[in-house]
């Protein structure tokens, strides 16, 4: 779907009338769940996940058949400040690895039966170092939001967004601090593995960015423009597109959650179509999920990003949907109810 906006005002307008889950499908799924051949609540959280999914896809007896994993890659001006354990050229190299099928995300997509798309966002033009000025111009932000929006496949019945961009945990930390308050140190973690003096330097970069843009940080769209990156903006655009199309979303780790938090800040409830696939080992991720009111499905100590934790959760959701839709009711099975 072509993005319905050509300006930041147009993007904001998307949130004026967001679709809600289908009430009839929710009612039907809830009723069916109560009639299945199991004790009430015996499948635990799987039951709630299946009903949530049914409401968003508008089917009381749904199927999960076309999950899409959309990866976005962008480069950051702040990478030149030594905030990552890897050089900026790794972004381009990892995109090539995705296309060759050699990354972890490729293997996990195969297991999950998910299609995978990779969108490169001006990799030859890093964003501006946000300690020196806004990371993106308004036009650059609109273009990145639109790229994310248009990357979502119309036929997808589940979306996972992932990212590649050296320096993007720094941008995510700055966004989280700007949206939720607190010091740079509370939100800045090891990312790709920095520690000691390098971690102190990374934290200082976040603090300098927050100070530089302090007067504009009450506007979540400006937070994204000034402190974010193209791939974070594209993830936000894709998640917004999914809401408009009532496509359920599984959120990934810290970076993805920070991008999604911008939408939550624009309008509370904007992430009702999303669940948290996992809680990552990046230290501030639990705090972001708590602010978003999201309970993670998995806790596996993962911190790779790229959508990987969310992809692992796809088969958990698929299992939930399969039980709701495939199990017999007591009446169908001729089993006496307890």
Curated annotation (Swiss-Prot):
Pathway the protein contributes to: Nucleoside biosynthesis; alpha-ribazole biosynthesis; alpha-ribazole from 5,6-dimethylbenzimidazole: step 1/2
A GO BP annotation: cobalamin biosynthetic process
Enzyme Commission code(s) on record: 2.4.2.21
Gene3D superfamilies (UniProt xref): 1.10.1610.10, 3.40.50.10210
InterPro entries: Nict_dMeBzImd_PRibTrfase (IPR003200), Nict_dMeBzImd_PRibTrfase_bact (IPR017846), Nict_dMeBzImd_PRibTrfase_N (IPR023195), Nict_dMeBzImd_PRibTrfase_sf (IPR036087)
Highest taxon above the source species: Bacteria
CDD domains, alphabetized: DMB-PRT_CobT
A Gene Ontology molecular function term of the record: nicotinate-nucleotide-dimethylbenzimidazole phosphoribosyltransferase activity
Catalytic residues of the enzyme: 306
Record's catalysed reaction(s): 5,6-dimethylbenzimidazole + nicotinate beta-D-ribonucleotide = alpha-ribazole 5'-phosphate + nicotinate + H(+)
Record SUPFAM superfamilies: Nicotinate mononucleotide:5,6-dimethylbenzimidazole phosphoribosyltransferase (CobT)
Assigned keywords, A-Z: Cobalamin biosynthesis, Glycosyltransferase, Transferase
Reported function: Catalyzes the synthesis of alpha-ribazole-5'-phosphate from nicotinate mononucleotide (NAMN) and 5,6-dimethylbenzimidazole (DMB).
Family: Belongs to the CobT family.
Name under which the protein is recorded: Nicotinate-nucleotide--dimethylbenzimidazole phosphoribosyltransferase
Gene (UniProt): cobT
